[in-house]
From Swiss-Prot:
Ranges of compositional bias, category Pro residues: 27-36, 52-61, 140-149
The organism's place on the tree of life at top rank: Eukaryota
Region (Nonhelical region (NC1)): 244-262
Role this protein plays: Type XII collagen interacts with type I collagen-containing fibrils, the COL1 domain could be associated with the surface of the fibrils, and the COL2 and NC3 domains may be localized in the perifibrillar matrix.
Residues covered by region (Nonhelical region (NC2)): 98-140
GO biological process, one term: endodermal cell differentiation
Protein name: Collagen alpha-1(XII) chain
Biased composition (Gly residues): 156-165
Claim: Iron-sulfur is one of the keywords in the record: no
Family, as annotated: Belongs to the fibril-associated collagens with interrupted helices (FACIT) family.
Protein species of origin: Rattus norvegicus (Rat)
Compositional bias annotation for Acidic residues: 288-297
Length: 317
């Protein structure tokens, strides 16, 4: 047989076939995760005042107040009625003149002492009398003797209410009350559309998930055959090779080998025909790699899938 011809030039790409039918849409994906809570809304208007609750329990009595200042001393009592005159004594014997003068001096001294004692007591009582018009003393005088208990006075008028006491301690929380009867269903209210709220914050970035592949579309009509390529560069002839089974008999198999070469009964095996020379594809040059894929439409397949597409078996292979 003659030498294999040169590899022809790559033919022009055929026209693209008609697009297949659109596959059925895939099943809807699962619902996405729940978004973050929105901002807090505006505070609503205050409701109507509720009914007045029952009065609470009375608070603990307040602490006793501070003792007030001591009052002014009372006015002196009225002078008592003069007592009855005593009985007249018997007339004594007439004494000597010297003794009479001595008795007079003693009597005068006793009278002066009595009068001075009464005057000092009277002055002391006068000093205790308050005098709002001519009193210049800032310090109260000494307390006077206790007067006789007076008669019970009339019942006084009720005094003004005292100042409010300090707030008592909060009471212990009572047990929860029984559940009330269900109220009647109110009439249906007529609501009006409120103002539009501010836009919420942007949600988290969604995850792109590949859906299930759609059904395969119908096969388009085959394109016109490409033009025949030019003959390629002639490759170097390969060495003729064949396998002699007698040379493989001495190779150990599972740890065991033949002690001497194996010779079949019919003699050594020789091939009936000449060895078939397998053509070897020459290495691609830089110009061939630059021109590869130039005649194909752009963006038909991603760059990382171009060689994968070339490795797929074509129709009829």
């Amino acid at each position: 047989p003659g030498e294999p011809g040169r590899q022809g030039m790559k033919g022009d790409a055929g026209e693209p076939g008609l697009p297949g039918r659109t596959g059925t849409p895939g099943l809807p994906g699962p619902p996405g995760p729940m978004g973050p809570p929105g901002d807090r809304g505006f505070t609503g208007k205050d409701g109507a005042m509720g009914p007045r609750g029952p009065p609470g329990p009375p608070g603990t009595p307040g602490s006793p107040g501070v003792a007030g200042p001591s009052g002014k001393p009372g006015k002196p009592g009225d002078h008592g009625r003069p007592g009855q005159s005593g009985l007249k004594g018997e007339k004594g014997d007439r004494g000597d003149i010297a003794s009479q003068n001595m008795m007079r001096a003693v009597a005068r001294q006793v009278c002066e002492q009595l009068i001075s004692g009464q005057m000092s007591r009277f002055n002391q009582m006068l000093n205790q009398i308050p005098n709002d018009y001519h009193s210049n003393r800032n310090q109260p005088g000494p307390p006077g003797p206790p007067g006789p208990p007076g008669a019970a006075g009339a019942r006084g008028e009720p005094g003004p209410g005292g100042a409010p006491g300090f707030p008592g301690r909060p009471g212990v929380q009572g047990p929860p009350g029984e559940r009330g009867l269900p109220g009647e269903k109110g009439e249906r209210g007529i609501g009006s559309q409120g103002p539009r709220g501010p836009p919420g914050p942007p949600g988290p970035q969604g995850e792109s998930r590949t859906g299930p592949p759609g059904s395969t579309g119908s096969r388009g009509p085959p394109g016109p055959p490409g033009r025949p390529g030019n003959s390629g560069i002639r490759g170097p002839p390969g060495p003729p090779g064949y396998c002699d089974s007698s040379q493989c008999a001495s190779i150990p198999y599972n740890g065991q080998g033949y002690p001497e070469p194996y010779v079949p009964e019919g003699g050594a095996y020789l091939p009936d025909r000449e060895p078939f020379i397998v053509p070897v594809e020459p290495e691609r040059t830089a110009e061939y790699e630059d021109d590869y894929g130039a005649d194909e439409p752009e963006q038909q397949h991603p760059d990382h899938r171009r060689w994968r597409r070339a490795l797929r078996p074509g129709p009829g292979q």
